[in-house]
Amino acid sequence: MERMNDNVLTLQMLCAEQGMEIDLPTLQQLARYGDCLERWNHKINLISRKEDAPVIIKHIFHSLLITLYHSFREGEDVLDLGTGGGLPGIPLSLLFPRTRFLLVDATGKKIAACQAMITELGINNAIALHTRVEELKGVVFDTVLSRQVAPLDKLCSYSAPLLKAGGTLICLKGGNLENEIAAAMKSNKGQEGFPSKVELHPIHGISPFFSEKQIVIVHGKNSSANND
């Protein structure tokens, strides 16, 4: 219980520093998710087992930083592509209970863990589905999220047919992305002009644990920055 309270206070402080006001019940749910994630990680490999930062910072707070650049709306349909242990989809689903999240991953054990965590946390606006993204048919989304390490051009090719007109791809990535962005822009001819614009938002100033991290926002022809 003491560790849970420490995680709640840590997350509350970090979010407040970024102007993110989150009520106590939601902070407690986010901390519970962190505990679930660590517990499941002992069973299957969801996140690195050689952590250099607390899970509440490196994974959960990191996921929440997307909200600095994107306002999730009521009724918005969001795809979490390659969700792994539910990141960033589960933290964001807790923060935005009126937004719909679909979490997909090609590894069945990871999705089973996500389903168990969603059930344990009582989340009713997120579904975890075991599938390959190429097999998603007949569905489109307002926003696609990804925290996986795939190159940006591949993430764009996966996302283009799954995004509604004006939709946006948001990635959490690290390192020098110059070559990845160039490759993604070169590939847009066969993807109805997606991407037409790529924004980079470094977050190294927020925490030393994010020294090389950036939030990448990829727009199509008809999309615009959604940070109202």
Curated annotation (Swiss-Prot):
It is found in: Cytoplasm. CDD domains: AdoMet_MTases. GO terms for cellular component: cytosol. Coiled coil: none annotated. It is an enzyme of class 2 (transferase). InterPro entries: rRNA_ssu_MeTfrase_G, SAM-dependent_MTases_sf. S-adenosyl-L-methionine binds at residues 82, 87, 105-107, 133-134, 147. GO terms for molecular function: rRNA (guanine-N7-)-methyltransferase activity. Keywords: Cytoplasm, Methyltransferase, rRNA processing, S-adenosyl-L-methionine, Transferase. Its EC number is 2.1.1.-. Specifically methylates the N7 position of a guanine in 16S rRNA. Belongs to the methyltransferase superfamily. RNA methyltransferase RsmG family. This is Ribosomal RNA small subunit methyltransferase G. It comes from Pelodictyon phaeoclathratiforme (strain DSM 5477 / BU-1). The gene is rsmG.
